[in-house]
Swiss-Prot record:
Name used for this protein in its record: Cytochrome b
InterPro entries: Cyt_b/b6_C, Cyt_b/b6_C_sf, Cyt_b/b6_N, Cytb/b6-like_sf, Cytochrome_b, Cytochrome_b_C_euk/bac, Cytochrome_b_N_euk/bac, Di-haem_cyt_TM
Binding site for a ubiquinone: 201
Pfam families: Cytochrom_B_C, Cytochrome_B
Source organism (scientific name): Neotamias siskiyou
Species lineage: Eukaryota, Metazoa, Chordata, Craniata, Vertebrata
Gene name linked to the record: MT-CYB
Chief location bin: mitochondrion
Gene3D superfamilies xref list: Cytochrome Bc1 Complex, Chain C
Membrane topology field: Multi-pass membrane protein
Cofactor descriptive note: Binds 2 heme b groups non-covalently.
UniProt: heme b b566 binding residues: 97, 196
Cellular component, GO annotation: mitochondrial inner membrane; respiratory chain complex III
Intracellular or extracellular location(s): Mitochondrion inner membrane
Positions with a binding annotation for heme b b562: 83, 182
Amino acid sequence: MTNIRKTHPLIKIINHSFIDLPAPSNISAWWNFGSLLGICLIIQILTGLFLAMHYTSDTMTAFSSVTHICRDVNYGWLIRYMHANGASMFFICLFLHVGRGLYYGSYTYFETWNIGVILLFAVMATAFMGYVLPWGQMSFWGATVITNLLSAIPYIGTTLVEWIWGGFSVDKATLTRFFAFHFILPFIITALVMVHLLFLHETGSNNPSGLISDSDKIPFHPYYTIKDILGVLLLILILMILVLFSPDLLGDPDNYTPANPLNTPPHIKPEWYFLFAYAILRSIPNKLGGVLALVLSILILMLFPILHMSKQRSMMFRPLSQCMFWILVADLFTLTWIGGQPVEYPFIIIGQLASILYFMIILLILPTISLFENKLLKW
């Protein structure tokens, strides 16, 4: 009798994706982040579902309903902080996952890569709308500032902003629709994840050397299931330390003040994971220019397959490119720091220099160094 795992129409798909999947024998811990992102998504959907049972998307009661969840609902505080800090863990894993892709040249699987970039946009949109829901000061002013950026679009800008707001300012209609979108987007993300995996399994995984590994494959289970479980345990450990010991470490104190349209907070800033993009936005004095730079800072990831000039796929054997890659990482840390600082000297000029360097490294320096490395190796 044939194993049901290999014959059943539904179980067969799971088998080919997670059990009998041929995987390279040398993939490192950097390949754990895909499964960790899957776990993050599951945690976010489950905690979000339980929060939605008690949350009300009305300007008069939204803030109170979040307070009610934390005070009166059984383990409501735990669910709420797991959801808030789960988002931070999600973005840490996302950034590391993208960084891994850049370092090891995984972007040469361009369908998988492009869907990954679309996923990044979708997760960022979801996180932004989620931040608006508690209806604190930073929720309200963050929503006002970020949605207002669309007014920079010529001709249709103002109409578009009012259409998104559902009125002439961020109000009840805005909150209600943001809640609706925040609820539906994770399911769209889940569907996109399946497409992402579908394209990945067409080609098979990349590996640290960047070489074809068809001659040396091992089954995913038990080797990488065990390895992934270790990653998951570490993820949950870090998340729970964050949730139970310092749940507000990554949040903004201003969000514990109910939204007040008549009182602007001294420093409007988004959550930490958007600060690098926010710094790029602020570094350009022109509104439309800033918005374009903001979008391009993420969209530029789609250009990596075109900008790849090296004869080698991975950066494993390219020390000059490695050096530039880590300078890019340091630059992103600098941008994140600048995004959280007030708009004054010397932060303005540091932000502008870091923004220029970000685009310069990706568009000019990395491709040039790759060509130089080809010459060094007489290729």
